[in-house]
Design a protein with these regions (language model features):
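Nucleotide-activated donor-binding/catalytic signature segment of Leloir-type glycosyltransferases, i.e.
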Residues: 44-76, 83
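Aromatic "clamp/platform" in nucleotide-sugar-dependent glycosyltransferases that forms part
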Residues: 89
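Short glycine/serine-rich donor-binding loops of glycosyltransferases
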Residues: 94-97, 112
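Short hydrophobic beta-strand element within catalytic cores of glycosyltransferases
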Residues: 106-109, 119, 123-127
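Conserved donor-binding/catalytic core segment of Leloir-type glycosyltransferases
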Residues: 1-11, 17-20, 32-33, 148
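C-terminal "capping" alpha-helix adjacent to the active site of nucleotide-linked donor transferases
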Residues: 131-175
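Glycosyltransferase donor-sugar binding loop
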Residues: 29-47
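Short acidic alpha-helix that forms the nucleotide-activated donor recognition element
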Residues: 69-81, 98, 102, 116
Length: 182
């Protein structure tokens, strides 16, 4: 599994990782690679965030990757996984997820926001969005600012895990997402 996008509240990264670890943590048949480094934060802030997500637990099947400074490195990352996760609750498009599906990767994608312009039941395992919450995190989203306002969809953890299990089954049948190549 590949988790993509710079770390932000609206992307539900923390909730995705915690739900994934609850179901698949230390099950070495599965691996979660997190390319969620946020270049707008200091390296130590990224490290603190990643540590806070998993707490004191030790997992053998998760890694947090640092910033990839070339498209070639990022492309290698996208090609290294069989399943991409796009669970953002406020996405304009989801370019890494879209690229991954176009590369023939299976995908677990929230059926909401900008994803709806390209993600279908045929090319992705669509998951339900959760409720809606205010977006404000006082880092990137400040109440009353002239931009980045509103609400985002939270993660429905049960739907997310169902989507992951469906993607695993699709991957077992054919490692290449033939519908993603269309």
């Amino acid at each position: 599994f590949n988790l993509v996008g710079k770390f932000e509240k609206r992307k539900n990264h923390k909730e995705v990782i915690q739900a994934w670890l609850k179901r698949f943590g230390n099950d070495n048949r599965y691996f979660l690679q997190c390319s969620i480094h946020n270049t707008f934060l200091k390296p130590e802030e990224n490290s603190q965030i990643f540590s806070s997500i998993i707490g004191n637990q030790r997992y053998s099947n998760i890694t947090f990757l640092t910033f990839m400074d070339t498209n070639a490195k990022y492309n290698d990352f996208l090609n290294s996984g069989d399943i991409v996760i796009g669970a953002s609750g406020g996405e304009g498009w989801g370019l890494p997820e879209f690229h991954s599906v176009g590369l023939g990767k299976h995908a677990v994608i929230t059926d909401a926001t900008g994803y709806k312009s390209w993600a279908t039941d045929e090319n992705c395992c669509l998951i339900k969005a959760g409720g809606k919450e205010e977006i404000y995190d006082n880092v990137f989203f400040h109440k009353g600012a002239p931009y980045n306002q509103g609400r985002y969809h939270t993660l429905d953890a049960d739907s997310f895990i169902d989507g992951c299990e469906k993607a695993i089954e699709r991957c077992r049948k054919d490692r290449v997402n033939q519908n993603g190549l269309k």
